[in-house]
């Protein structure tokens, strides 16, 4: 029931009224975070701040635990993760943010690759569990601190701090979910069909994709492959021929083959969604 409530609240959060960028530039003018804020990110993941011409956006004002958690849940859902509970509608201290964010990231598999020492001198009142979660955030460059030696754990989290922190979380999630691959080759033909073929070898998975184009002259490559909830999504970079270039009106096919290392993938079956193809083919 909690998970359903969370999903409903995120849907409401994303369906807030029309968003414009009218006043955010004014409110960030001269602010230390001006160059760090991605306006599109704010509009998408913090729509309650962007609503009505960013009327609720005040960089140095505090953000509630519920608003922060809803934005975090919305971000997680974009990477096929989820969690229950949306927090309390009260102030959120920086150490409580560490507890909430660190525990959620730990649950989805983020870990400390190096046991780097935390430099902050004002964390002696934090529990040992919270300090380990802080280490996780610090090691992954999600939380840097008020200064090189100060975290200010008891201070309430501000709107602009929440935005910057979740922007860094997005970068971490992107890295966690990106699958490295090797392009083996691409060929063009005039007699084929759109399809996706998956072949398993001892240590590798070979994926062959064929896409139809209305004329020759198109280029096709894979931009990235991302892990999803029950498989992987392949994102393509497709460029049409130059508009002033004469092309015969002949249907052509591009067949692209990529290689993925099994040890970087989850357990089979290997399900792939082709971005733009609207189909899923599994092995």
Language model features with spans:
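Feature responds to low-complexity, polar/acidic, surface-exposed segments characteristic
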Residues: 4-38, 46-66, 73-131, 144-159, ...
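Exposed, flexible binding/inhibitory loops of compact, secreted disulfide-stabilized domains
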Residues: 21-23, 34-35, 41-42, 109-119, ...
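Active-site-proximal beta-strand/loop segments in catalytic clefts of secreted hydrolases
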Residues: 71, 146, 237-239
